[in-house]
Amino acid sequence: MTPTLKQLFEKHNVKGLSNNSKTIKANDAFFAIKNGNDFIADALEKGAALVITDDKKNTTNKVIFVEDIKETLHEAIELFYPKKPKTMIAVTGTNGKSSVVSYIAQIYSLIGQKAASIGTIGVEVFGIDNFNESIGGLTTTDYLSFRKIAHKLAKNGIDYLAFEASSHGLDQQRLGDLKVNVACFTSFSQDHLDYHHTKENYLLAKLKLFTDHLAKDGIAILNSDIEEIKFIKDYLDKHKIKYLCVGANGNCKITKTNSSLKGQNINFIFDNKNYDFDTPIIGSFQASNLLIAGPSVYYTSFDFSKVINALTKVKAVKGRMERVNRTNIFIDYAHTPDALEKALTELKNIKAKGGKLSIIFGCGGNRDTTKRKLMGKIAASIADNVIVTDDNPRHEDPKAIRQEIISGIVTTNYIEIADRKEAIKYGINNLKKDDILLIAGKGHENYQIIGDEKIRFDDAEVASMSFLATAGIQ
């Protein structure tokens, strides 16, 4: 009789699971998925108790063949990491995912719940001290890694989890068969066409969140200002998915925002009632992010007045319109045409009369090349001064990337400075009273990728040091 997976694991004294030979621990079962078969010997050498493969050539007494390795992995995950927070909210969108998942977790915490968020900026935990967990460089990590973190969070008493669901992750089924209580769509614009090839493919990948992962009694929360909102609503109607729209044309209708360098006041109508609240978070585009986060929590059975009160206390996310040393220098992750346009437009609208708006940015290498020229055009059309520099060039020629950006600039209000640190110094040294400087593209990142090398680099840190040096404080 063929042993069950549980019996097999007991026989080989398996203590954990891994699908990465680099991080495998002694007595793990190693799942050789795709090119993982090339690392079976490495996994065994590092102490793997057992290897699961779908390649018959490699079988031994410790290397077991299965027909469907992904299904077997999911079965194994339920054996080893069965726990997860009781309420989960997933957020997709071109821009705004990191902000919304953090806002959701913060709201839960502010109303007395233990909550966490997972995404681009890592794992944020509220209500538990000394929780230490990191994720790799993916917005949506693989299913095994996700379930390990979710299991650990649940074991530590976390009841509420908000996480980012990227188009790559959804397309590659990194969420497995996971079901969520609420699914949010923050925004949609050009990005990742190097992977999806067309905007239609990109949109359909994101919509998998709602058809594949939203629980039957769950709700979708959509940004009504998405250009493709009619298509999205028709798609959800076709699949009988309940949804709420947030925005200027939504069921949760944003009627007015008053913004300044100190924050904003947001007015909206929800359930036929008028509300308003103040927030220190800068950016009128963040109004929709905050009001996607608020109802997300409300629809998991919390009083709306408590949610509104919490919204006034929510803090900005690192690298998202982050203000440096209370100056007029801002760090933002804007790395798409739409995000760049929104960030620049917002800062232009709130800058003092007579002040100039400058931007420092570049574009990542080995990523969507079609957006570079457009981003150059957008930057030059809104900002008074543009400084084109390097982002994460990776394996591309940095100068060629800069030239693609510059090809979209039809004015003469730009300068090219390859070294990002020097570009930031230059931008800060040339700031005058009432001027605003936006350093865009990398946001929270504390590294720069050049070739295969990851070099320590933090925009906010460099900007802070440059400002203090310019002010004569250092």
Curated annotation (Swiss-Prot):
Keywords: ATP-binding, Cell cycle, Cell division, Cell shape, Cell wall biogenesis/degradation, Cytoplasm, Ligase, Magnesium, Nucleotide-binding, Peptidoglycan synthesis. It is an enzyme of class 6 (ligase). GO terms for biological process: cell division; cell wall organization; peptidoglycan biosynthetic process; regulation of cell shape. GO terms for molecular function: ATP binding; magnesium ion binding; UDP-N-acetylmuramoylalanyl-D-glutamate-2,6-diaminopimelate ligase activity. Pathway: Cell wall biogenesis; peptidoglycan biosynthesis. Its EC number is 6.3.2.13. GO terms for cellular component: cytoplasm. ATP binds at residues 93-99. UDP-N-acetyl-alpha-D-muramoyl-L-alanyl-D-glutamate binds at residues 21, 139-140, 166, 172, 174. Carboxylation is probably crucial for Mg(2+) binding and, consequently, for the gamma-phosphate positioning of ATP. It is found in: Cytoplasm. It catalyses: UDP-N-acetyl-alpha-D-muramoyl-L-alanyl-D-glutamate + meso-2,6-diaminopimelate + ATP = UDP-N-acetyl-alpha-D-muramoyl-L-alanyl-gamma-D-glutamyl-meso-2,6-diaminopimelate + ADP + phosphate + H(+). Its cofactor is Mg(2+). The modification N6-carboxylysine is found at residue 206. A motif (Meso-diaminopimelate recognition motif) lies at residues 391-394. Catalyzes the addition of meso-diaminopimelic acid to the nucleotide precursor UDP-N-acetylmuramoyl-L-alanyl-D-glutamate (UMAG) in the biosynthesis of bacterial cell-wall peptidoglycan. Belongs to the MurCDEF family. MurE subfamily. This is UDP-N-acetylmuramoyl-L-alanyl-D-glutamate--2,6-diaminopimelate ligase.
